[in-house]
Amino acid sequence: MAKIIWTRTDEAPLLATYSLKPVVEAFAATAGIEVETRDISLAGRILAQFADQLPEEQKVSDALAELGELAKTPEANIIKLPNISASVPQLKAAVKELQEQGYDLPEYEDAKDRYAAVIGSNVNPVLREGNSDRRAPVAVKNFVKKFPHRMGEWSADSKTNVATMGADDFRSNEKSVIMDEADTVVIKHVAADGTETVLKDSLPLLKGEVIDGTFISAKALDAFLLDQVKRAKEEGILFSAHMKATMMKVSDPIIFGHIVRAYFADVYAQYGEQLLAAGLNGENGLAAIYAGLDKLDNGAEIKAAFDKGLEEGPDLAMVNSAKGITNLHVPSDVIIDASMPAMIRTSGKMWNKDDQTQDALAVIPDSSYAGVYQTVIEDCRKNGAFDPTTMGTVPNVGLMAQKAEEYGSHDKTFRIEADGKVQVVASNGDVLIEHDVEKGDIWRACQTKDAPIQDWVKLAVNRARLSGMPAVFWLDPARAHDRNLTTLVEKYLADHDTEGLDIQILSPVEATQHAIDRIRRGEDTISVTGNVLRDYNTDLFPILELGTSAKMLSVVPLMAGGGLFETGAGGSAPKHVQQVIEENHLRWDSLGEFLALAESFRHELNTRNNTKAGVLADALDRATEKLLNEEKSPSRKVGEIDNRGSHFWLATYWADELANQTEDAELAETFAPVAEALNNQAADIDAALIGEQGKPVDLGGYYAPSDEKTSAIMRPVAAFNEIIDSLKK
């Protein structure tokens, strides 16, 4: 039997799965397709790490490793929902919950090395054995033109800007080499006195692979940050920091610590020795510092110094004004790819402590991609907000296969312990890359393999040809890595028929301006980018165009011939879960799942000639468009339609479409009674689903909710369940 793998993940998409997956299973079965769940949730991955220490009845398999292997085969057809990229505080909370549920797990401090495997963004790099094709589906774009989301007005007097280093950072210190032959290199630190320390003893590289090394200077970073704290205060705007501490799990928490210490420079000048000795260096955020002060004898005195620092420093952008949670409280609370587009959409403002919006200084220390956001800000200051009813679209073709570029750098990122040099040394002793570094600098290496680069260029040409859109490679001539990539892109473009296609290479700043000039004219442009800009652009443009990145179609054509279908580019929405717990209303929009599912069925048609799967896909697309037009998407407000209601209406419209289509008589016959039953009971089922809302519920866990309790909450109406379950019989 053909098989689609549906991933069990975390938070809002996990809750939605309890409601949606039974519908998907029932419909898929009519095309001879089995839908199988694999658990790659944070809780599931933690338990898999310690399977050797758990009793037989508690053991779970390493589903992520299994899916990683499956992704390298032509059989792969995986629907991947958003999962938690865990920060240390999230990991500790999940471990505590599992311990309370009876799992004998060690404390984080006692098994840091093993837990490291589940911190940060560990899921996507394992599954992404292909490059990325993300675009706004036509149905969604059409819907937004009819029902545009709110866009904040921009003022020509806006004081909002990006602050970035521009020197002594990752961008400016980069060196890059294309390997002539396969080799295994060593990364080592040579101290000023000649002492050698091996940082990575064996790094195998393939012929044609691009290897980079770069570093950010700690001294330059500190000087830059002190200037920005002063600048925000002088300009009377919010101070905000925008990092990606989840994905860049080694470098960005260190940089975040520098930001916290710069903002509270006076506190660290007075109490720094004691704070650092207690491990309160800011790298886990202000919340962790406050928690740690309780254990210090003079904790109250130091807390008062922090309060004074907040009072005297520039106002901080807030994550939750009501609860006093600032931008600096938790490193994973403000994630650049979501926070910057949200700010641009909100008139260039962020929320202040009085719960009002205010202009902000967006501090993005490394200048590699900061210019993209500054370009959009300047354009909005000059030309006003974008208009969702007329604007063009910017789909993305992203290089990400086999842990390309920065998003594969964690195991090659090091905090430098002493002044000296870092060298990347070939097996014959040649030094390929060398940097002079100082204590505290952050040095990192990135790898980009040749086969993914070739596949990326091919995918860009294919998308340009199929869509008829111009395609622009975003490559920065000021960066050594991008200069090497430009050489390879030009070489591989020559292997393709590009006659009649508009393909060019621009720097990220030029490419941004080019794309937004065209957007304002209602014209479409494919952005062809590396891995980080893939991440940033597939939030930036969708949030401006569609109001959210969760409505993107995200396809990863796997290099071995399988398919990975990602549901939206947003996160796992912890606030949505909070609302369920408090008032049993799930506002998560499963549109991303609907779009991915249609593509997954289409993949079965294209690879296995399963025509029934093709009919399911087309009917699902039509049902999704109807769902949008009939305004059956979840509301944010309790007492109105939520995620469960949208699943009911999708099932109804999908059954209607299948009953009424003429391509497959057997499917039409199967779905006629289902459609009739759903339509006959529609008013009652809809009312019953809404009637469930308005009271607190117990999921039996947050990271590892109880299947029984959560299923009852997410499938509360027996009449609907019976109709769906009858399809499986």
UniProtKB/Swiss-Prot annotation:
Any GO MF annotation of the entry: metal ion binding
Substrates-to-products reaction catalysed: D-threo-isocitrate + NADP(+) = 2-oxoglutarate + CO2 + NADPH
EC category: oxidoreductase
Cofactor note: Binds 1 Mg(2+) or Mn(2+) ion per subunit.
EC annotation from Swiss-Prot or TrEMBL: 1.1.1.42
Residues where D-threo-isocitrate binds: S121, N124, R128, R134, K244, Y407, R534
Cofactor(s) annotated in UniProt: Mg(2+); Mn(2+)
Record flagged with keyword Nucleotide-binding: no
Binding site for Mg(2+): D337, D535, D539
GO BP, sorted A to Z: glyoxylate cycle; tricarboxylic acid cycle
Residues that hold NADP(+) according to the record: N83, S85, N124, S572, H576, R587, D589, R636
This protein's UniProt keywords: Glyoxylate bypass, Magnesium, Manganese, Metal-binding, NADP, Oxidoreductase, Tricarboxylic acid cycle
Membership in a protein family: Belongs to the monomeric-type IDH family.
Known partners and oligomeric status: Monomer.
Function: Catalyzes the oxidative decarboxylation of isocitrate to 2-oxoglutarate and carbon dioxide with the concomitant reduction of NADP(+).
Full protein name: Isocitrate dehydrogenase [NADP]
